C-alpha cells in the first residue's frame, strides 16, 4: 500500500534500493542481519533466526 515507505505505490514491491516491504525479518525496508532472533523459543523448541537474505522467519530444523 502507498502508506508503507518501503513499498512502490504502483507495484507494492520494494522501492529501488530497498530489500523488503514487510515481514518479521524486515525493518526499515532492509533485511535484518543473519542471526537476529525472529521467533523466540516456546517450550522445548529453539529460537528461530533471520537469514539476512529474506524477510521471512524460517523455522529451525529442530522444531519438536
From Swiss-Prot:
<protein>
    <recommendedName>
        <fullName>Disintegrin VA6</fullName>
    </recommendedName>
</protein>
<keyword id="KW-1015">Disulfide bond</keyword>
<comment type="subunit">
    <text>Homodimer; disulfide-linked.</text>
</comment>
<feature type="disulfide bond">
    <location>
        <begin position="6"/>
        <end position="29"/>
    </location>
</feature>
<dbReference type="GO" id="GO:0005576">
    <property type="term" value="C:extracellular region"/>
</dbReference>
<dbReference type="InterPro" id="IPR001762">
    <property type="entry name" value="Disintegrin_dom"/>
</dbReference>
<feature type="domain" description="Disintegrin">
    <location>
        <begin position="1"/>
        <end position="64"/>
    </location>
</feature>
<keyword id="KW-0800">Toxin</keyword>
<feature type="short sequence motif" description="Cell attachment site">
    <location>
        <begin position="42"/>
        <end position="44"/>
    </location>
</feature>
<feature type="disulfide bond">
    <location>
        <begin position="38"/>
        <end position="57"/>
    </location>
</feature>
<dbReference type="GO" id="GO:0090729">
    <property type="term" value="F:toxin activity"/>
</dbReference>
<comment type="function">
    <text>Poor inhibitor of platelet aggregation. The disintegrin inhibits the adhesion of cells expressing the RGD-dependent integrin alpha-5/beta-1 (ITGA5/ITGB1) to immobilized fibronectin. Inhibition on alpha-IIb/beta-3 (ITGA2B/ITGB3) is low, and there is no inhibition on alpha-1/beta-1 (ITGA1/ITGB1), alpha-2/beta-1 (ITGA2/ITGB1) and alpha-6/beta-1 (ITGA6/ITGB1).</text>
</comment>
<feature type="disulfide bond">
    <location>
        <begin position="20"/>
        <end position="26"/>
    </location>
</feature>
<keyword id="KW-1201">Platelet aggregation inhibiting toxin</keyword>
<dbReference type="InterPro" id="IPR036436">
    <property type="entry name" value="Disintegrin_dom_sf"/>
</dbReference>
<dbReference type="Pfam" id="PF00200">
    <property type="entry name" value="Disintegrin"/>
</dbReference>
<keyword id="KW-1217">Cell adhesion impairing toxin</keyword>
<comment type="similarity">
    <text>Belongs to the venom metalloproteinase (M12B) family. P-II subfamily. P-IId sub-subfamily.</text>
</comment>
<keyword id="KW-0964">Secreted</keyword>
<dbReference type="InterPro" id="IPR018358">
    <property type="entry name" value="Disintegrin_CS"/>
</dbReference>
<feature type="disulfide bond">
    <location>
        <begin position="25"/>
        <end position="50"/>
    </location>
</feature>
<keyword id="KW-1199">Hemostasis impairing toxin</keyword>
